[in-house]
Amino acid sequence: MEPDLSFRGRRALVTGAGKGIGRAVAVALCKAGARVTALSRTAADLESLVRECPGIEPLCLDLADWDATEAAVGAAGPFELLVNNAAVAMLQPFLQVTREAVERSFDVNFRAVLHVSQIVARQMIAQGLPGAIVNVSSQASQRALRDHAVYCSTKSALDMLSKVMAMELGPHKIRVNTVNPTVVMTDMGRINWSDPQKSAAMINRIPLGKFAEVDDVVNSILFLLSDKSAMTTGSSLMVDGGFLVS
């Protein structure tokens, strides 16, 4: 994908950048002129990303480690753009939900977003920089899905966190929005939804009749990061083919 938006000279941090949506966002921002720091807990993914796009600065870090995150993200900044993409999906029936699933999911999907955003926003404010933050949420924040009790809950919490962030950071010229995709055809998405019966049941609920491609989500993120959306904050951009209206 060749983005037609310019981020020349702007500093960007992308979490969960080793694979899928986060990786594609990091590459797209780099091609659009941004100075990108790509964060992942998997060193091999970062190594292959840097080979693909040598201008990217890798940052290997587990966001569940609060103190390490404070030190590493603080030292890597300041940033003007932030994409909180890192997430886990530990799917279990409600009656079998484990403490481990709850703690890990909220650590990564909610607590890490709050913490990274605090670090980055404080630096933006200290530097007098306007900025944009995009939190990658999900249609699951607004629609119950079987076996998704914890995941749906973390994404719902993320949506409300984003709205409060938008309210409190707006006076500092920092915009905060979410993108809320349906199933996305990342490598993992293609594997998880390869069963025709399972995928057909979901696609039948999507008016456009298809799952999202990675570029569909990347384009939405780039728009929300860009000055093209200068008056947009506190919003959730649905990238769901109409799933939520069906």
From Swiss-Prot:
GO molecular-function term, one example from the UniProt record: L-xylulose reductase (NADPH) activity
Places the protein is found: Cytoplasm
Tissue-specific expression: Highly expressed in kidney, and also found in high amounts in liver and testis. Low expression seen in all other tissues tested.
Active site: Y151
Any single biological process term in GO: xylulose metabolic process
Known role: Catalyzes the reduction of D-erythrulose to D-threitol with the concomitant oxidation of NAD(P)H to NAD(P)(+). NADH is less effective than NADPH. May also catalyze the reduction of L-xylulose.
PANTHER family xrefs: D-ERYTHRULOSE REDUCTASE (PTHR44252), D-ERYTHRULOSE REDUCTASE-RELATED (PTHR44252:SF3)
Protein name per the record: D-erythrulose reductase
Source organism: Gallus gallus (Chicken)
